[in-house]
């Protein structure tokens, strides 16, 4: 956590929030095992290094105009998105059984469903899901979150 360096404010909460999210993703990506450690954490984070990034993020959201309750909830939403995205990038959400017999059976079942036309929407999206760069996906999600905060505040 001490490696997280909150980016300097640019005076635009949209960019400040996105830059902080990018930095958090970068830091988490540098340490693949930190996600497991965080998931196993049984007590609240209370060290100065662990709470400063939280304080900074909530400050950005308060600066956007959110009241303290909405800022806290938005903090959890942004955090869940960033950590979930990093877990997905690291393959933690897919499972560790790649190549084993059960996983190969699941892939075969999935291929049959696609071939049979049972998943028309997913089939249509598969090329995009497969080829979309991680950075592009991450930025798309950040844009949705930032626009959601603006919507909550009655801005377009």
Label every model-predicted segment.
Residues 34, 67, 84, 119-120:
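A general structural signal for well-ordered secondary-structure junctions
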Residues 6, 33-34, 87-91, 151-155:
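Charged, solvent-exposed alpha-helical segments that act as regulatory interaction surfaces
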Residues 54-92, 96, 103-108:
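A contiguous pocket-lining binding segment that forms or flanks enzyme active sites
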Residues 1-2:
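Short, basic, alpha-helical segments at the C-terminal edge of helix-turn-helix-like DNA-binding modules
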Residues 63, 91-156:
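C-terminal peripheral helix-coil segments that are non-catalytic and often amphipathic
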Residues 5-54, 71, 75:
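Hydrophobic alpha-helical connector segments
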Residues 9, 26, 63-67, 130:
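Amphipathic alpha-helical interaction elements
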């Amino acid at each position: 956590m001490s490696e997280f360096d909150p980016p300097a404010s640019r005076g635009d909460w949209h960019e400040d929030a996105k830059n902080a999210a990018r930095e958090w993703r970068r830091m988490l990506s540098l340490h693949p095992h930190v996600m497991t450690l965080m998931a196993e954490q049984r007590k609240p984070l209370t060290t100065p290094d662990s709470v400063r990034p939280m304080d900074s993020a909530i400050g950005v959201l308060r600066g956007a105009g959110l009241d303290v309750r909405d800022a806290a909830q938005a903090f959890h939403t942004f955090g869940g998105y960033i950590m979930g995205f990093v877990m997905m990038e690291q393959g933690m959400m897919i499972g560790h059984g790649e190549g084993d017999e059960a996983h190969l059976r699941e892939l075969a079942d999935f291929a049959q469903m696609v071939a049979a036309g049972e998943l028309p929407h997913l089939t249509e999206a598969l090329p995009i899901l497969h080829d979309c760069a991680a950075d592009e996906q991450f930025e798309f999600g950040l844009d949705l979150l930032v626009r959601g905060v603006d919507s909550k505040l009655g801005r377009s």
